[in-house]
Amino acid sequence: MSSNKVTAAIIDYLKQAITTGSISEEEKESLEVAAQCIQDSFKIKPEEIKPKSGDRLVAAFEEYEKLHPVEEDSTAHVNKEEAEKLKLEGNNAIAAKDYQKALDLYTKAIEIDPTSPVYYSNRAAAYNQLGQFENAVEDALTCLSLDPHHARAFGRLGRAKLSLGDAAAAADAYKKGLDFDPNNEVLKRGLEAANKQLNQPSDSSATSGADQARTSAGAAPDLGSIFGGGMPDLGSLMNNPAVMNMARNLMQSGALNNIMNDPNIANMARNFQSGGGMPDLSSLANNPQLQNLARNFMNNNNNGNTDNNNQGNPPPQ
């Protein structure tokens, strides 16, 4: 078959599609333009376009496929099996809490098969466990670009966003995940945690988040932040919930006696009692005993708030 006959058959096939196909008017116009462009480009005369030549072209192609079947790429099949093996090893590493090893294994699986949404979702879970939340967001979004209905990816995205302080985005992610998996308890708990954070006053949330970050890094909490950065009077101190809560804990734990044995603290107290004015709060904030006490106080408060660490992390697939 000459090239002109093939071209003419293609034009006939397009014209048949226009008249017999269930296509919209806009699509018909596009096919008409395409057929005319091909005819003009190859200088095909109208009499060269034989009726039903398009059908014969399709039949010839189908016959060729029967005689020359496309063989499955065995190498690709083997590679996918290797990627699945790496994924399973990564899942085992997650179960053993070896998150860095899991991350490395998922990365190798992605290098072999970058089209699997599950690998990105699982690596997002590993990133979350390692505290690399920006990377977790990126992997979760990549997974969702490959599979928009992947509920677990929404959970991992929600946890990363919540850990980054974006409670609104976290709540949105958890809600979308629940649209596809309404009975998922992890997503439900994650949404509850995100809504709880959204309902907290913004200033106290920011202060709490900063204090937790400093405490988790091993640094002393900022005692000065309790006083709002200024030098308060005694009345405002007594009305400050954070100060009163700390005072109650001091008295209940018996730690107040240890503090008063510190010569610097005792001297400040005597000076205040004798009319020497308010003590230097900057010095108080830098006192090692007070810093250590505040750190322990904050850690005790945080012990009851560990649910967020488990949000969005069901077992990997």
Swiss-Prot record:
Residues 198-215 have a biased composition (Polar residues). TPR repeats lie at residues 14-48, 83-116, 118-150, 151-184. GO terms for cellular component: cytosol; membrane; nucleus; TRC complex. Its main location: cytoplasm. Gene3D superfamilies: Immunoglobulin FC, subunit C, Tetratricopeptide repeat domain. Keywords: Chaperone, Cytoplasm, Nucleus, Repeat, TPR repeat. SMART domains: TPR (SM00028). It comes from the Eukaryota. GO terms for biological process: post-translational protein targeting to endoplasmic reticulum membrane. Pfam families: SGTA_dimer, TPR_17, TPR_8. It is found in: Cytoplasm; Nucleus. GO terms for molecular function: membrane insertase activity; molecular adaptor activity. Residues 198-224, 298-317 are annotated as: Disordered. Disulfide bonds: none annotated. Belongs to the SGT family. Co-chaperone that binds to the molecular chaperone Hsp70 and regulates Hsp70 ATPase activity. PANTHER family: LD24721P. This is Small glutamine-rich tetratricopeptide repeat-containing protein 2. The lineage of its organism: Eukaryota, Fungi, Dikarya, Ascomycota, Taphrinomycotina.
